[in-house]
From Swiss-Prot:
<feature type="transmembrane region" description="Helical">
    <location>
        <begin position="283"/>
        <end position="305"/>
    </location>
</feature>
<keyword id="KW-0997">Cell inner membrane</keyword>
<dbReference type="InterPro" id="IPR002528">
    <property type="entry name" value="MATE_fam"/>
</dbReference>
<feature type="transmembrane region" description="Helical">
    <location>
        <begin position="164"/>
        <end position="186"/>
    </location>
</feature>
<dbReference type="GO" id="GO:0006811">
    <property type="term" value="P:monoatomic ion transport"/>
</dbReference>
<keyword id="KW-0812">Transmembrane</keyword>
<feature type="transmembrane region" description="Helical">
    <location>
        <begin position="92"/>
        <end position="114"/>
    </location>
</feature>
<keyword id="KW-1133">Transmembrane helix</keyword>
<comment type="function">
    <text>Multidrug efflux pump.</text>
</comment>
<dbReference type="InterPro" id="IPR050222">
    <property type="entry name" value="MATE_MdtK"/>
</dbReference>
<feature type="transmembrane region" description="Helical">
    <location>
        <begin position="320"/>
        <end position="342"/>
    </location>
</feature>
<dbReference type="GO" id="GO:0015297">
    <property type="term" value="F:antiporter activity"/>
</dbReference>
<feature type="transmembrane region" description="Helical">
    <location>
        <begin position="422"/>
        <end position="444"/>
    </location>
</feature>
<feature type="transmembrane region" description="Helical">
    <location>
        <begin position="393"/>
        <end position="412"/>
    </location>
</feature>
<protein>
    <recommendedName>
        <fullName>Probable multidrug resistance protein NorM</fullName>
    </recommendedName>
</protein>
<dbReference type="Pfam" id="PF01554">
    <property type="entry name" value="MatE"/>
</dbReference>
<feature type="transmembrane region" description="Helical">
    <location>
        <begin position="248"/>
        <end position="270"/>
    </location>
</feature>
Amino acid sequence: MQKITHWQEYKIEAKSLILLSLPILLAQIAQNSMGLVDTIMAGRVSAADMAAISVGASIWMPLVLFGQGLLLALPPTISYLNGSAQRHRIAHQVRQGIWIILFSIVPLALLIYHSDTVINRMGMEEHLAQITIKYLHAMLFGLPAYLLLVNFRCLNDGLAKTKPAMIITLIGLLLNIPLNYIFIYGKLGVPAFGAVGCGIATTIVNWIMCILMISYTKSARNQRDLKVFENIIELPNPATLKKLFKLGLPIAIAICSEVALFALTSLLLSPLGTNAVASHQIALNTSSFIFMLPMSLGMATTILVGQSLGERSPLKAKDISYVALFIGLATATLTAFLTVVLRYQIAGIFVKDTEVISLAASLLLLNALYQFSDAVQVVVGGALRGYKDTKAILYITLFCYWVLGMPIGYILSRTDLITAHMGPTGFWIAFVVSLTVAAVLLFYRMYKIQKQSDEQLLTKLEKLK
């Protein structure tokens, strides 16, 4: 029998990572496209309706992402159990995930329902405030469905089955457009709800996607041995919930801190004028789109690293981490090159104002530089989640974003302490600095974990399963 060389192993691992991450990427694109469709279709009603979607999303997203972050403890846990021939324990994790939803949904729902307290103090027009509040209240009915969808998606992702979520999200996107048309503009005898109609349509889509994901999970042949639905309602298990919260809470806080960083940046730039905010938003939108590539790769890395560790193969987990890092940097090289070459054309997609295009193009140069650090920190972060080392991600993220990034950005952007105030350029320089430091620290953390003896590492992971 011919022995497989290291190079052949790397090729196999690279293929596995790409095949696993592509459906995740397409699902992310479809999910983000729903928000884009909502904005465009609401904008055809009025500027106030479009603005309501934007303001509502700025409140909705951090809260929902927190709930989603808690459930992201499931993929590394499930992939580890799957790899270690402990599939009989997977159903228990999924059922306890439902308890995580039940515990988190009450405070999240209350915050969304009473968001009028914040909105009414933002100083916006009364008409806009009322549309935003009604939009969020409509979205609220879809919150349980969305979190249940994430719970069962995490099960499938942990089993390295990423295609179902891709197909279901694409179906959701296709349904979102006609449902928006009916509820926004008032068709088929339904009243015209404007932006609120987007909330109604999204709620319906979330419930449909949730039902489809649960139906797939229940009928999939490769999951019948798990018996997830035999006793779907089980009592909360304090030990399991503690382990899942211990893994998920740092992820949830880290996600929210990142969302909050960019939201606060936009607010701090607002006094500098429309052009500054617009150019920053162009660079941020471009960055968010490109970010889906390393993020998908990072999620695939979590799954395969967790599975390899479950198979008691730390060497394979290490190899997967470095192969993923190579793919991430290779992808960043391509996207950074395209960003630099096409920076004026990219800015021109968003606006026609030459001054805004020029400023946005200069920010996109910094954005191109930032992509390398971003790729490293996202992929290495994915590997660390596979090692179930989520606290390190939280501490490093908080330090780099809030102790380094925000103060440096504010000083360079808004003050003359170091140089003449640089406007949005100052914040983008800070992003490059903070992400580079984060990438170095996260990589060092991964290196330290991988230096542990196999026995020491596997014993620790067994305690966390």
